[in-house]
């Protein structure tokens, strides 16, 4: 099982709606998470790579105060997978998207893979 799948399953086990990218469509009618591959980097000539994983937190327009609550809840859940996955400390500011009538912020995590995993 991949790290992505472990994080996805851990969030889902805690009764939070979670989706892979480009699956949830339309307006934000309830709180949910999108789990997104944030890319990879390789240091120098080493074969290991650092993989970034973005947790995108969405809440409806009228539930702005839920944004930080849901974000904190998800961070506590994902932090339970440490040291498999580690927070980078990067979080975006809240952003309102009129096209989906919802608020979003993201929390970034990282993990390391060997070779071309």
Description of each model-found segment:
Residues 27-36:
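Short, well-ordered secondary-structure micro-motifs within conserved domains or adaptor modules
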Residues 1-22, 36-117:
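Charged, amphipathic alpha-helical segments and their flanking helix caps
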């Amino acid at each position: 099982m991949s790290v992505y799948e472990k994080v996805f399953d851990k969030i889902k086990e805690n009764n939070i709606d979670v989706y892979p990218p480009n699956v949830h469509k339309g307006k934000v009618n309830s709180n949910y998470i999108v789990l997104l591959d944030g890319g990879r980097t390789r240091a120098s000539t080493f074969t290991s790579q650092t993989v970034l994983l973005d947790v995108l937190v969405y809440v409806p327009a009228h539930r702005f105060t839920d944004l930080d609550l849901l974000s904190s809840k998800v961070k506590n859940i994902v932090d339970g997978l440490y040291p498999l996955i580690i927070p980078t400390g990067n979080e975006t500011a809240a952003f309102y998207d009129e096209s989906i009538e919802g608020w979003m912020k993201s929390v970034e995590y990282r993990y390391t893979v060997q070779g071309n995993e």
